[in-house]
């Protein structure tokens, strides 16, 4: 699926895993993207406070969530978790967001940045950077649909 290139804005990108969330953000003109330290996921979602601090610190206006679809473009168990987390985060942060198919982003970041067997979360944040770069090139635009901040996937 091809989307229109989105309008420039400062965006946070999330690569959501079961243990950590990789983070990256772009400048308001979508020219440069930078990684942030990955955050640990907690059962009570206390990592949202850390994410909120980054949103405020960098004056970010929305976020994107990588959705790991399978080779055929179908939802996986992890994709459902990512989609639900994105909706939860949008409700907590009151920000618009979108989903991006992030199939193979971890493999690509490992190959592109030479990261192997990483337990620090660095590979997760580089994966978030790849997701962000994909969004900058392809979209979709962040939207609010029917009062809920989401894009149907």
From Swiss-Prot:
The keyword NAD does not apply. The lineage of its organism: Bacteria, Bacillati, Cyanobacteriota, Cyanophyceae, Synechococcales. One of its GO terms (molecular function) is nuclease activity. One of its GO terms (cellular component) is cytosol. It comes from the Bacteria. It comes from Prochlorococcus marinus (strain AS9601). InterPro entries: RNaseH-like_sf, YqgF, YqgF/RNaseH-like_dom, YqgF/RNaseH-like_dom_sf. The keyword Repeat does not apply. Keywords: Cytoplasm, Hydrolase, Nuclease, Ribosome biogenesis. This is Putative pre-16S rRNA nuclease. Belongs to the YqgF nuclease family. Its EC number is 3.1.-.-. Could be a nuclease involved in processing of the 5'-end of pre-16S rRNA. It is an enzyme of class 3 (hydrolase). Coiled coil: none annotated. GO terms for biological process: rRNA 5'-end processing. It is found in: Cytoplasm.
């Amino acid at each position: 699926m091809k989307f229109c290139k989105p309008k420039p804005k400062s965006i946070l990108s999330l690569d959501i895993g079961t243990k950590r969330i990789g983070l990256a953000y772009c400048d308001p003109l979508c020219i440069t993207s930078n990684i942030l330290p990955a955050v640990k996921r907690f059962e009570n979602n206390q990592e949202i406070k850390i994410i909120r601090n980054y949103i405020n610190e960098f004056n970010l206006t929305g976020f994107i969530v990588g959705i790991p679809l399978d080779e055929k473009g179908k939802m996986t168990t992890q994709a459902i978790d990512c989609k639900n987390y994105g909706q939860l985060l949008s409700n907590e942060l009151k920000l618009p967001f979108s989903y991006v198919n992030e199939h193979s982003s971890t493999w690509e970041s490992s190959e592109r940045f030479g990261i192997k067997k990483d337990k620090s979360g660095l590979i997760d944040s580089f994966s978030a950077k790849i997701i962000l770069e994909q969004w900058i090139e392809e979209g979709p635009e962040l939207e609010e649909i029917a009062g809920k901040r989401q894009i149907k996937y």
